Amino acid sequence: MAPVRTASLLCGLLALLTLCPEGNPQTVLTDDEIEEFLEGFLSELETQSPPREDDVEVQPLPEPTQRPRKSKAGGKQRADVEVPPEKNKDKEKKGKKDKGPKATKPLEGSTRPTKKPKEKPPKATKKPKEKPPKATKKPKEKPPKATKKPKEKPPKATKRPSAGKKFSTVAPLETLDRLLPSPSNPSAQELPQKRDTPFPNAWQGQGEETQVEAKQPRPEPEEETEMPTLDYNDQIEKEDYEDFEYIRRQKQPRPTPSRRRLWPERPEEKTEEPEERKEVEPPLKPLLPPDYGDSYVIPNYDDLDYYFPHPPPQKPDVGQEVDEEKEEMKKPKKEGSSPKEDTEDKWTVEKNKDHKGPRKGEELEEEWAPVEKIKCPPIGMESHRIEDNQIRASSMLRHGLGAQRGRLNMQAGANEDDYYDGAWCAEDESQTQWIEVDTRRTTRFTGVITQGRDSSIHDDFVTTFFVGFSNDSQTWVMYTNGYEEMTFYGNVDKDTPVLSELPEPVVARFIRIYPLTWNGSLCMRLEVLGCPVTPVYSYYAQNEVVTTDSLDFRHHSYKDMRQLMKAVNEECPTITRTYSLGKSSRGLKIYAMEISDNPGDHELGEPEFRYTAGIHGNEVLGRELLLLLMQYLCQEYRDGNPRVRNLVQDTRIHLVPSLNPDGYEVAAQMGSEFGNWALGLWTEEGFDIFEDFPDLNSVLWAAEEKKWVPYRVPNNNLPIPERYLSPDATVSTEVRAIISWMEKNPFVLGANLNGGERLVSYPYDMARTPSQEQLLAEALAAARGEDDDGVSEAQETPDHAIFRWLAISFASAHLTMTEPYRGGCQAQDYTSGMGIVNGAKWNPRSGTFNDFSYLHTNCLELSVYLGCDKFPHESELPREWENNKEALLTFMEQVHRGIKGVVTDEQGIPIANATISVSGINHGVKTASGGDYWRILNPGEYRVTAHAEGYTSSAKICNVDYDIGATQCNFILARSNWKRIREILAMNGNRPILRVDPSRPMTPQQRRMQQRRLQYRLRMREQMRLRRLNSTAGPATSPTPALMPPPSPTPAITLRPWEVLPTTTAGWEESETETYTEVVTEFETEYGTDLEVEEIEEEEEEEEEEMDTGLTFPLTTVETYTVNFGDF
């Protein structure tokens, strides 16, 4: 019976084939006709049970049973790809359940011979089709799979040519499939299930699964003609060998395969496959897919993600995103094909054209690249924007080591055991200790900077710590690394700041540091990095400053500074000029900017003002403020700001942003928060510029003790000691350049900008040792319970009141300097809330810039300390500019307060180096080369005196008003004979000249000595006259200095008592108008040869001794005559 049945089945199949021509399969039979035909066969086979045995006999082929299973795993993922004949068997199952497609399958069977030859090229195309779905998930898998599958396809193609055999096997398989659903009668319900799920296993028996899988796929392969997919594990192993950078993307949700089945895409990819096959095949030749056998149950990999996360499944909801993903998936496949590279981004193709594999990896890296870390500025621990009451701690070792001392770069006082030490230190090290900062607003914290204790004795610092956050200071959340509290590593020494960044920012209001381990005692200083999240509310609205000036708010290197000054000069060429003071020890130029209506020239009556900064290289705020001031003055002058225009037109302003460029370059390498207190402070040679000037205080005070001032030692413009002028003197290169610059320009007022404190310091900076009288007076005052200011007065300058006025003018205009609640930056507030302090009382030191400027020149110099943070963050520059802008302008305007004028003689010729002194102030000023002077004075009435050598002094009363604007006080001096008198005294060795009384009788010896003395004086007068004539005749021809002419070889001329040596020439002496008379007594006795000067002096001494004896000599007659000398 079995042969009869098989024969009947074959006949039925042949009948179906004849009814379905190859060209038009769908036009011959409809779905209803096919169903009726199949139901007829099923009805015949329902009562027969041996078909299962036949099935077992027909099923000896193991490959079709295994491959359909593999196709199940890969079918969902490779819905777009044409599957080889084995895989088509699985799709036949799908078709059979979809009764309509069954008709198409047999029709396609007729086309098998035509499709089989075509399957070889599609094999290459099939591989790319498998790639796109995987590419959608992870494009890296596409190329490797394409290379692996081509190897399996050629052998499968050889099996296909036997079309007859396949027809013979397909017929019994189809009949068996029809027999199985009939007993249960769920065919109508189960067929749609097969459509949704291409791998039905639940409703079939264990033996039937293999049979159905082997039988059903054979009519369907002609429909889809897709290659079978390899085992998923085999594919992964092969991909690992091919390219380690490819990311596996095998999992996909079950509904996606239906969406991916884009049939029109197959022909497009087929043409591209051969090229890819050639490129990828060589590395895959030695690789063979592992065989797991029929019993191996393939797990469901659709829900698993290997090694890498895959974001694409999150995007399929949006249609546009899915389309973009598809386009991106196609790009990696089309790398090898030149015609389709045009669709890709030109820049990416050009960048990665030589590296196809890495290029895909780079695309994925861009997708998964972490967001750039937010860089936040300090919240203000070091700059004291965080107030003391915003910092708390679990405990403190003593009052001087409280939480408020835990600021970054906090400096200890001179006595480390006082109330101002250099860190926060905990009391009990056994308990959990912490220090907390309240930002008073929601803040995004990004890091913490820690530092050890500032001490010359102790070596204390924290090595590891935890970090916690809170919004209410009650509930704290520790920062973790995902599974435990994250440990941050701190310092390895006590001075170097160390940054500990948070891997991910945390938004909170409070932050705590929990030290874990430490060296020495538990002490630390810190700064917190954070960005405000919430807007500024009422509390900060009073303190926040927003600038409206369009300036360059950033830190400038040496090159940037030079470029900025050049840009300002080009923008305002009529009022600016850039020049150099000299060079540093490393050869960097010290640049200066002059701002005036006539740059480059000193105008008569126009005062000169200077701002200097960067004396210490790590004190950067002053440097940036002067660069901002340059830009501001230029912009406002061009915009017509009347205040700035008046200042520029009436003042010659000099701005030097960096006096120590070498030190700045050292400090800038570490940045604003990571340089310690002293890094970059000194020059390259190791000098502190501020304290490297000649010590003139000691010279002046020693002269005052000897009562030599102002007769032998002046009280102003003291000369520099010789030991500082020698080439071997230990003076820095920068100081030499600064002194030369100060002597060339007649500065009136100046200030040097520093950092580390918030105050204004004025001279003296050197502490003067009190005298015995002052110490005694202080002791008596203390015994009586009174305050004696004798010692404090010893530290004050004669212009103490004027210095205080100038200091207050800057501090009062500063927005934060005079706020008493802020206190001192490092220790107690020495200013008592006024923002000004005497340098000797605050920080005594010798040889400072301020003292030297006051004693050696006419310039009143002050030191301005701009803030607690020497090197503020770039984000704080706008705020600091607004805090200091008004103060900088106000202080410059003070140069026009006091008196000014010009000193000339009666002919209107200016007198240089004339001294202007004010009664009550034991310090004068000198006139400039043009005879003009400026004297800063407080409002009031003053008696001013002008005197110069060779001129008669002149005095007048000058009034100074409160308004800005100096009072004009000019002086005209008349010539005096003091110059000639000094010359005569010099001729006599600066000894008193003896005058002989004519009525007194003289001995012959006295008369002889008198004659010799007179002759000697006449000869010296002639030599002086000849010397002056030589000096005024013109420059000497020889480079050697002119020597004194030797005595005249002509014989001495004997003069009668009434004769006078006639003048040989009438030159410049005739222009002199003043004369004086000298009474000379001449004896009638004649003398022969002249005596030497030594002999005359010896005889004069003998004569004095004889006169002391009181002996009487014979009387002789004498004559008296007058000699008139021109005043030279």
From Swiss-Prot:
GO BP terms: proteolysis; regulation of collagen fibril organization; regulation of DNA-templated transcription
SMART domains (UniProt xref): FA58C, Zn_pept
Region of interest (Interaction with MAPK1 and MAPK3), ranges: 412-615, 997-1128
Keywords of the record: Calmodulin-binding, Cytoplasm, DNA-binding, Glycoprotein, Nucleus, Repressor, Secreted, Signal, Transcription, Transcription regulation
GO molecular function: calmodulin binding; carboxypeptidase activity; collagen binding; DNA-binding transcription repressor activity, RNA polymerase II-specific; metallocarboxypeptidase activity; RNA polymerase II transcription regulatory region sequence-specific DNA binding; zinc ion binding
Residue ranges, compositional bias (Basic residues): 113-163, 249-261
Induction conditions: By TGF-beta. Expression is also induced by a high fat diet.
Signal peptide coordinates: 1-25
Listed GO CC annotations: cytoplasm; extracellular space; nucleus
Region (Interaction with PTEN), start-end ranges: 546-976
PTM remark: Phosphorylated by MAPK1 in vitro.
The Peptidase M14 domain, residue ranges: 554-895
Disordered as annotated region, ranges: 40-367
UniProt-listed SUPFAM superfamilies: Carboxypeptidase regulatory domain-like, Galactose-binding domain-like, Zn-dependent exopeptidases
Required for DNA-binding and interaction with NFKBIA as annotated region, ranges: 381-546
CDD domains: FA58C, Peptidase_M14NE-CP-C_like
Disruption phenotype annotation: Two independent knockout mice have been generated for the gene encoding this protein, and these exhibit different phenotypes. Mice lacking exons 7-12 exhibit reduced growth rate and body weight and resistance to dietary-induced obesity. Individual adipocytes from these animals are hypoproliferative while the adipose tissue is prone to apoptosis. Mice lacking exons 7-16 die perinatally from gastroschisis, in which abdominal viscera are extruded through the ventral body wall. Surviving mice exhibit deficient wound healing, having dermal fibroblasts with reduced proliferative capacity.
Spans annotated as Required for transcriptional repression: 932-1128
Tissue-specificity statement: Isoform 1 and isoform 2 are expressed in adipose tissue, brain, heart, kidney, liver, lung, skeletal muscle, small intestine, spleen and testis. Isoform 2 is expressed in macrophages. Expressed in aorta, preadipocytes, adipocyte tissue, brain, heart, liver, lung, skeletal muscle, skin and spleen (at protein level).
Glycosylation site positions: N519
F5/8 type C domain span: 374-531
PANTHER family: ADIPOCYTE ENHANCER-BINDING PROTEIN 1 (PTHR11532:SF48), PROTEASE M14 CARBOXYPEPTIDASE (PTHR11532)
Family as reported in the entry's similarity comment: Belongs to the peptidase M14 family.
Subunit note: Isoform 1: Interacts with different types of collagen, including collagens I, III, and V. Isoform 2: Interacts with GNG5, NFKBIA, MAPK1, MAPK3 and PTEN. Interaction with MAPK1 may stimulate DNA-binding. May interact with calmodulin. Binds to DNA in vitro.
Protein name: Adipocyte enhancer-binding protein 1
Organism lineage string: Eukaryota, Metazoa, Chordata, Craniata, Vertebrata
